[in-house]
Amino acid sequence: MEAKTLGTVTPRKPVLSVSARKIKDNAADWHNLILKWETLNDGGFATANSIANMKISLSSKDKIELASSGLASNDCAEKEHPEYSRELETLCEELQATLEGLTKIQMKMEKLSSTTKGVCELEDYHHGEERKRPPLFHTWPTAHFYEVSRKLSDMYSQELRLKRTVVEQLAHTADRDLALSYLSMWLHQPYLEAGSWLLLESMLLETGHRVL
């Protein structure tokens, strides 16, 4: 009698509940949104750097050309250097477009926090107190997903407000030190605490997107 060859059996993955699937999808969305934010931020910094360099260069030329006059440098900038004015306007439009892109991302982050809160409330409604039910994945209580989402969303909301200020002020700044300060703020994103990536990676690990 011929021996039958058994096929390789692949262990089935545990079936996730509706709430767990939604939380896992949200974690992936967080990862994608943050990557998109970083890409836009890098492009925005390059644009902001060009604006700052142009303003500093223009201011230096005006100071030399108008050394003997009583007019301020910025008063004659557009008249004396119309080509700079056109290029500066284009760069400012690019930076504004970047800001609008970041704003859309932050709005999606807010929505993620809202949907995560909804999942937590649904779990509470169906299963009662958190301490009396098992976690959706490994160790995190359901409410912790909302806490992390809310914290991340607040960080990016504050950072967006700072970037809006930079966009509004940078093109009107002729002072070199102030322009460099604005650039530093944009690049280093002070409201995005060092722990933001740790929060994201912890959430990805908990939901199974990352493995130890």
Swiss-Prot record:
Keywords linked to the UniProt accession: Acetylation, Cell cycle, Cell division, Coiled coil, DNA damage, DNA repair, DNA replication, Nucleus, Phosphoprotein, Ribosome biogenesis
Location(s), subcellular: Nucleus
GO MF term set: preribosome binding
InterPro entries (alphabetical): Cyclin-dep_Kinase_2_interact
Post-translational modification: Phosphorylated by CDC7 but not by CDK2.
Top-rank taxon, per record: Eukaryota
GO cellular component, one term: nucleus
One GO-annotated biological process of the protein: cell division
Entry-annotated residues carrying N-acetylmethionine: M1
Modified sites of kind Phosphoserine: S69, S73
Coiled-coil ranges (or none): 74-106
Function (record text): Component of the DNA replication complex, which interacts with two kinases, CDK2 and CDC7, thereby providing a functional and physical link between CDK2 and CDC7 during firing of the origins of replication. Regulates ATR-mediated checkpoint signaling in response to DNA damage. Part of the 55LCC heterohexameric ATPase complex which is chromatin-associated and promotes replisome proteostasis to maintain replication fork progression and genome stability. Required for replication fork progression, sister chromatid cohesion, and chromosome stability.
Protein family per UniProt: Belongs to the CINP family.
UniProt subunit comment: Homodimer. Part of the 55LCC heterohexameric ATPase complex composed at least of AIRIM, AFG2A, AFG2B and CINP. Interacts with AIRIM. Interacts with CDK2 and CDC7. Interacts with the components of the replication complex, MCM2, MCM3, MCM4, MCM5, MCM6, MCM7 and with ORC2-containing complexes. Interacts with ATRIP. Interacts with CEP152. Associates with pre-60S ribosomal particles.
Protein name (Swiss-Prot/TrEMBL): Cyclin-dependent kinase 2-interacting protein
Source organism (scientific name): Bos taurus (Bovine)
